[in-house]
């Protein structure tokens, strides 16, 4: 009895302790008796063993190959050798060019053939000083080539105008243009008056081309502001804010009126073309001085035999430099380049060449403003110079300018064709082919059956 009672008390104590353990949270049980898990089976990692920068195909992993190394070294040596030879050839060519230029100077000095046209480098320095533009070596070399071929240079300028404006380069058919053409056809009026009308028409055409360009409306609006502030006509007075609010159509209507007033009132500008003193000069001494200066220009102000801007002729270098000197200081910075483009067509060949080079090779200034070609327009010019050219989309700007310069130089020096498109080159014979000339008697008297001979 005593044994059974002790067993029952032990069971009750165990049951009570079991209930207490069962009522505890699972976490407490795990703390008391943590479970031991067995490790899983061995697996191979599927992720990259190398960092992301080196896990790509061939990234940072180099396999040494003696044949590949020798080939790379040989290719590097060949490229360095070709580059050195190209530099030597360039130095040789520049030396030869300097010698030929010196011989030409001596020949012109001895033969009395010197004229008033400056060398191209002197014209370049003048444009850089007055207009604030700059030229690199590539532009200078192309301008020198174009200046020696004025006819082909004008053809190239017409091609560039077509791709730049999308038109035939006719510009604005203003009343001045029609008056100048009529005077040329009838033979009326002197060369100075025709040159003055031609100049005004060319400036109008340049402003019309500027309006059609991307971003040209901003420069167009700035030019209108400058001419409004400089105008002495009360009817042309406009505030700067009112010009900012003008639409394109209103600017187009206001521009011709302002331009005529601006050009007519510019001191000494018309006299540089016509060679006649302007009425209303202040003081007798000033009038005599102005008249003498104008007469000095008017003696040879227009050289109609030099080509250029049509019947109006090309201004002599002295007259054109006076136009340049009088126009730029009196105009605004934005209008200066536009006016310069207007009479660059009437300028001597050196200035026309520099203007054309600035148009087709804009350099760091980009394109789309002041007549400079954009990249898309440059590609169009390349296709005109070389119709079969391809693979130009992925080329950079510097490569594009080099190709344009080379093809433009080739276009200038090649024989005259149709005046607009370069003549196709004759196919070159393969290196193994040998071209033989038949005897003189065979050239004039072919033998019988020669057409059927397999050797002919």
Swiss-Prot record:
Composition bias, Acidic residues: 281-293
Signal peptide: 1-28
Source species, domain of life: Eukaryota
Keywords recorded for this protein, A-Z: Signal
Biased composition (Basic and acidic residues): 418-428
Chain spans, region Disordered: 167-189, 273-310, 414-456
Key word Signal present: yes
Protein name: Ezy-1 protein
Naturally occurring in which organism (per UniProt): Chlamydomonas reinhardtii
Gene symbol of the encoding locus: Ezy-1
